[in-house]
Amino acid sequence: MQRVNEASIAVLNDLGTLDPTFDVQQIGLGLLLTVEIEPDDDEPTIDMMANRVLTLRCFDGPQGSLPQSVQEIRGEVLSIPQPLTSLHSPATGRPQLVAEDTDDEHANLTWIRFNEALRSGNVPVYEGRYGARMRIGSIVDGPFQFTLISD
């Protein structure tokens, strides 16, 4: 999760050009989320994590303090699905991305539910597309990067 001044996402087609069936999604001040869904994530976990995102006080206040959440600043969220992957880096120097053994349908539906939970906090939420190749742009307000874990 990154605090951003602006961010955007476009979906690419098989040729690496913009997919005309997907409207570019853009936000102003808010949060850029890269969301990984674990196989055991369930509705209570999703609700808890959405609440953490909505209430995390990570936006500036007086004298460098961080007293405000994305809800309080009336910010926006750009949510990007991140399938679980690992990088296998052999001695040959040619790394390979290896997809973890996950249920894509569960991950996609759970990610959609997570975005709905964010929206229930009265924050505008824009989305990428699960399983798609995407071009992501951002102007980070930081350096602030947060990792929220459900444990």
Locate each region found by the language model:
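Compact, glycine-rich, soluble single-domain proteins
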Residues: G28-R74, P81, T85-A99, H106-R113
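Glycine/charge-rich, flexible interdomain linkers and switch-proximal surface loops
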Residues: P62-V77, Y126-I139
